[in-house]
Design a protein with these regions (language model features):
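GH16 jelly-roll
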Residues: 1-194
């Protein structure tokens, strides 16, 4: 996982952004220590915390369409090994997400805590405990869809209609990491993010 000067993330995006949504599963900048899960959509998706709760806390805007979809609505993990240098030092981990008509949930498991049903290719979200992010109360069928996953692993379509696009990238500086560069401890090691 990148640290200083970077904006690493893994996300899914639909066509005609932000109208068919974006789900940021792993995201942060510079020396952040906690992962941020963010939804971006057209205006009007104002999710609540879903049934069963979440371990993370709400951050940013209530409306996932804030700022024309650019800002989004987020949940920040409460697990110190979920991002950045602690993630790396801990040997990484596994993120799992579940997207249904009624909720979008994301779990994080440190490398040593990955459930056996995930390791054995038989995932059972009902056994994973409370997710770090649990978005509910939005019309997810309207705001999120037609997303494609680009992966080296073969994927199956569910009901023949969902395609996903998953992107993992590490942006050097960029809009977000560059904008908060001066307020991070990274600025002490380099006077600019350029």
């Amino acid at each position: 996982m990148g640290t200083s000067l970077t904006h690493p993330d893994s996300w899914m995006v639909g066509p005609n952004w932000p109208n068919r949504g974006e789900i940021d599963i792993i995201e942060g900048v510079n020396l952040n220590t906690y992962n941020q899960v963010t939804l971006h959509s057209s205006p009007g998706c104002v999710p609540s915390v879903g049934s069963g709760g979440q371990t993370g806390h709400n951050i940013g805007n209530a409306d996932c369409g804030a700022g024309g979809g650019f800002t989004g609505c987020g949940r920040e993990s409460n697990i110190a090994t979920s991002y950045g240098t602690a993630f790396n030092a801990n040997g990484g981990g596994v993120y799992a997400s579940l997207w249904t008509s009624s909720a979008i949930k994301v779990w994080y498991f440190a490398a040593r805590d990955v459930p056996a049903n995930i390791r054995n290719n038989n995932p059972d979200p009902n056994s994973w405990g409370t997710p770090i992010a649990n978005f509910a109360g939005c019309n997810f069928d309207e705001k999120f869809g037609s997303m494609n996953i680009v992966s080296t692993c073969p994927l199956a379509k569910e009901n023949g209609k969902l395609t996903w696009h998953e992107i993992f990238d590490i942006t050097f500086c960029g809009d977000w990491a560059g904008a908060v560069w001066g307020s991070s401890s990274c600025a002490g090691s380099n006077p600019s993010c350029e």
